[in-house]
């Protein structure tokens, strides 16, 4: 059973293929960055992939039918993304020896930066999403009905 109210606007069918394509692009950037050692050649690559990941996870959270997206709960989305990012950082720490040899101090700094960028990416998306819902509640992006 969905936790959205009956008056919530449905997500249009074209949003899902776009979100899946976006997610695949972010995965390709991440794993391509590992495979071709882009992370070590471009200092900003990690920032790019984490900010794009934060945007993508926030989009999934906002567009899933079981996720309530009223203004009060919209504030929580970046915090949930931060928690998911923290989980990923634990995974990364456990398996880092396979692809990188960092000191613990450097890893702690990198983790902090990654989590900030995850949070900022999510905050950017939720701010855009919240404003879009507020200004155009029946917009083409957020509803299957045509815009007024």
Whereabouts are the PLM-identified features?
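Bulky hydrophobic segments
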Residues: 1-109, 119-148
């Amino acid at each position: 059973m969905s936790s959205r109210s009956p008056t919530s606007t449905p997500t249009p069918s074209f949003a899902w293929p776009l979100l899946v394509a976006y997610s695949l692009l972010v995965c390709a950037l991440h794993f391509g960055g590992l495979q071709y050692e882009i992370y070590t050649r471009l200092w900003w690559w990690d920032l790019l992939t984490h900010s794009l990941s934060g945007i993508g996870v926030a989009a999934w959270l906002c567009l899933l039918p079981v996720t309530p997206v009223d203004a009060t709960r919209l504030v929580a989305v970046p915090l949930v993304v931060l928690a998911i990012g923290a989980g990923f950082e634990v995974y990364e720490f456990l398996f880092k020896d396979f692809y990188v040899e960092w000191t613990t101090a450097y890893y702690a700094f990198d983790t902090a930066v990654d989590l900030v960028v995850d949070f900022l990416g999510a905050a950017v998306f939720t701010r855009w999403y919240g404003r879009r819902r507020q200004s155009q509640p029946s917009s083409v992006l957020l509803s299957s009905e045509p815009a007024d």
